[in-house]
């Protein structure tokens, strides 16, 4: 885990006893940001607040959406990798990343690259196998793309989406 916001609900709301939890937030192999070959590469454990300055320059609408994504404290620990791995239907980053044709690197016994649109298998179900994790998110940087994100929620900030839409082209 990095932020652990979804996992915490497993304990507090469902009373699940989680025996093996590993903190990945300080793992340097999962905590990085770099631009290479017209792509933004983000380590899966990189906090949302660390990503914001890059997104503000590349995709301002995406950055603006993240400013409504939880409190400052949550954005300091929450990660896109965690948001994707939980496969929550209310995850705000998934529609944007899919609209941008993003990919993820999954690592376990083997390493594989997967288009994000093929990663989700159903409600809280993904392609991840036992002993695999999301290592990296790859977002294409295309100056010809336009991106608009729209989030509707009961409260303006720090609330789950009732409706979320991302359009790119």
Task: Describe the function of each predicted region.
Residues 1-169:
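C-terminal structural segment of proteins
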């Amino acid at each position: 885990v990095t932020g652990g916001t979804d996992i915490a609900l497993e304990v507090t709301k469902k009373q699940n006893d989680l025996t093996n939890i590993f903190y990945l937030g300080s793992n340097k192999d999962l905590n990085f940001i770099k631009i290479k070959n017209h792509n933004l590469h983000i380590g899966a454990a990189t906090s949302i607040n660390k990503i914001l300055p890059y997104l503000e320059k590349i995709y301002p609408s995406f950055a603006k959406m993240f400013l409504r994504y939880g409190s400052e404290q949550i954005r300091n620990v929450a990660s896109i990798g965690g948001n994707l791995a939980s496969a929550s239907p209310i995850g705000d980053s998934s529609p944007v990343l899919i609209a941008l044709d993003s990919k993820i690197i999954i690592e376990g016994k083997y390493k594989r690259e997967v288009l994000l649109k093929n990663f989700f298998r159903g409600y809280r179900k993904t392609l991840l196998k036992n002993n695999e994790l999301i290592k990296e998110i790859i977002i294409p940087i295309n100056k010809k793309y336009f991106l608009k994100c729209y989030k509707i929620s009961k409260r303006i900030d720090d609330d789950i989406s009732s409706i979320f839409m991302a359009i790119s082209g």
